[in-house]
Curated annotation (Swiss-Prot):
It is found in: Cytoplasm. Its main location: cytoplasm. It comes from Shewanella pealeana (strain ATCC 700345 / ANG-SQ1). It catalyses: guanosine(527) in 16S rRNA + S-adenosyl-L-methionine = N(7)-methylguanosine(527) in 16S rRNA + S-adenosyl-L-homocysteine. This is Ribosomal RNA small subunit methyltransferase G. The gene is rsmG. Its EC number is 2.1.1.170. Keywords: Cytoplasm, Methyltransferase, rRNA processing, S-adenosyl-L-methionine, Transferase.
Length: 207
């Protein structure tokens, strides 16, 4: 059932995946549903809704990624990082979260599904000082873009960018962009079966 729905959703948004990648995505939903009962990893309880609200909501960002090394900040159970890592085996994803139960879940996913391009790190973002900086900083966890830029400003390379996954955009929030940052792209995302606004903002640092 989920496999057929995933095929339809991928076709609807013009994304391609191998049979192995599709199996990994469906198995990820299965693991999320199983662990969620004990560890409360997401408020979404229904696997079909997980496929839409977590898997597809993450994957629609994939065509807009530039670079090869990314960090997903406040990743929770691995969203959007794990679905994006499955679809982009040539890119590297660091998944950052401060809660141990989420990191344990991610590591179990990595082990059971054989995902080799993710690293899970338990840390608060302000305490995390990476040896190598990132092409892209991803997050759908922050309440505001201002918060994201404040807490994550030290993570991208000089020519890297921030990818803020947002729902409805507020003009007030957009007008309060911190000094030294500029929005280069505002992309409306279409998620199958989701009648809610979704946007991706790309933000860069300016000297």
């Amino acid at each position: 059932m989920l496999s057929a729905q995933l095929n339809d959703y991928l076709a609807e948004v013009g994304l391609t995946a191998t049979e192995q990648q599709k199996k990994q995505l469906v198995d990820f939903v299965g693991m999320l549903n199983k662990w969620n009962k004990a560890f409360n990893l997401t408020s979404v309880r229904d696997p079909e809704q997980m496929l839409i609200r977590h898997i597809m909501d993450s994957l629609v960002v994939s065509p807009h990624l530039k670079g090869s090394r990314f960090i997903d900040v406040g990743t929770g159970p691995g969203l959007p990082g794990i679905p994006l890592a499955i679809l982009n085996p040539d890119k590297e994803f660091v998944l950052l979260d401060s809660l141990g139960k989420r990191i344990r879940f991610q590591k179990q996913v990595q082990f059971e599904l054989g995902i080799n391009n993710i690293s899970s790190i338990e840390s608060r973002v302000e305490a995390y000082q990476p040896k190598d900086l990132f092409d892209g900083v991803l997050s759908r966890a922050f309440a505001s873009i201002q918060d994201m830029l404040h807490w994550c400003h030290h993570l991208p390379k000089a020519d890297g960018c921030f990818y803020a996954l947002k729902g409805q955009l507020s003009e007030e929030e957009m007008s309060q962009m911190p000094a030294g940052f500029v929005v280069t792209d505002t992309i409306e995302l279409k998620v199958p079966k989701l009648d809610e606004q979704r946007h991706l903002l790309r933000v860069i640092k300016q000297d």
